[in-house]
């Protein structure tokens, strides 16, 4: 299966880096099935970035959590990760809480909106996907195929 990643530099050998803030599925290396989404990730750096392609081969011995859709379990998992609580999964896959959804997640986590209000606000205009790798063993499922520079067409 082909996965994409967008960044500001070539990432031939992915790593799990601790960022300044917790992401949807906690610290990890994030990819997507969607080419256009990876392009948006790459272009967030001043309109120029690197688009990567990886070959992903699943390993049945790894602990994987997959959310097919935005569900109550997905919301609770993201809130827990965004609050800085680690999990025991090698790989987590599911929808993204994009920038707008992130604000709703944060408002829900802070008790500013109800669960029902979150779901009313959280309707996506386009589908999203992310798969995050959280252990060295999980990164072994990825093989770098290529990375190339792209520019914003605007």
Which residues fall in each region the model found?
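A broad, structure-centric signal for solvent-exposed, well-ordered loop/edge residues
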Residues: 11-13, 38, 63
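Extended catalytic/binding region for NAD+/ADP-ribose chemistry, centered on the ART fold
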Residues: 20-45
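Conserved NAD+-utilizing ADP-ribose enzyme module
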Residues: 24, 44-154
């Amino acid at each position: 299966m082909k996965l994409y990643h967008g960044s500001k530099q070539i990432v031939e050998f992915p790593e799990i880096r601790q960022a300044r803030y917790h992401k949807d599925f906690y610290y990890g290396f994030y990819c997507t099935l969607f080419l256009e989404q990876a392009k948006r990730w790459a272009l967030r750096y001043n309109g120029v970035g690197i688009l990567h392609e990886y070959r992903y081969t699943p390993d049945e011995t790894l602990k994987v959590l997959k959310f097919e859709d935005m569900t109550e379990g997905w919301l609770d998992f993201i809130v827990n990760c965004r609050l800085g609580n680690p999990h025991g999964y090698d790989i987590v896959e599911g929808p993204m809480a994009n920038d707008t959804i992130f604000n709703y997640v944060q408002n829900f986590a802070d008790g500013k909106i109800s669960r029902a209000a979150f779901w009313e606000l959280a309707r996506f205009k386009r589908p999203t996907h992310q798969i995050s790798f959280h252990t060295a063993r999980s990164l072994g499922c990825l093989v770098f195929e290529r990375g190339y520079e792209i520019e914003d067409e605007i």
